[in-house]
Amino acid sequence: MKNLLFVLSFFLFFSCEALVKDEPVKELSATAQAIKNYKETFEWSKGFESWSKVPTTDDYHMVAPLIGLEATGAAEIEEIIFGFVNETELKQELVDIVELGSYITCFLKLTTKTGETFDGVEVFQVDEDGRVDKIWAL
């Protein structure tokens, strides 16, 4: 019986080692890297100027349902979305960025000029040419 317990203990010890091996860290695509750089260097006063370095389609669309904002194309995005960003002096801290297929997701800590802080998530859908086509700010 002691031998059986020893063998079972030995078997359990080695079979309970980590089954998940560390995956090598995947490098971000050029578009995801551009978004990451934009988020990490974000200044509300230069928001659209910095954002314009990220590749987008001509008629890319953004919606921020919690604050009632929606815009299509660079001119509307600059006026509506970045108008809000400038008005609120919105600060963004990138917590994490994840890329999966044609989606890039940013997890953010946001702070307004009044000191209000909240968590946010932005999901970017990228087309087959690596250009941002849709953005959901949640």
Task: Please report, for each region that a protein language model flagged, where it lies by residue.
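Sec-dependent N-terminal signal peptides
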Residues: 4-13
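Short, low-complexity N-terminal intrinsically disordered segments enriched in polar/charged residues
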Residues: 16-46, 50
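A beta-strand edge to alpha-helix "cap/lid" segment located at domain peripheries
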Residues: 17-30, 62, 75-138
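Stable alpha-helical elements in mature extracytoplasmic
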Residues: 34-37, 73, 77
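Hydrophobic alpha-helical core bundles mediating ligand binding, dimerization, or RNAP-core interactions
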Residues: 35-38, 42-45, 55-56, 81, ...
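Conserved catalytic core of Hanks-type protein kinase domains
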Residues: 54-55, 126
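A short gly/proline-enriched turn/hairpin at secondary-structure junctions
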Residues: 59-72
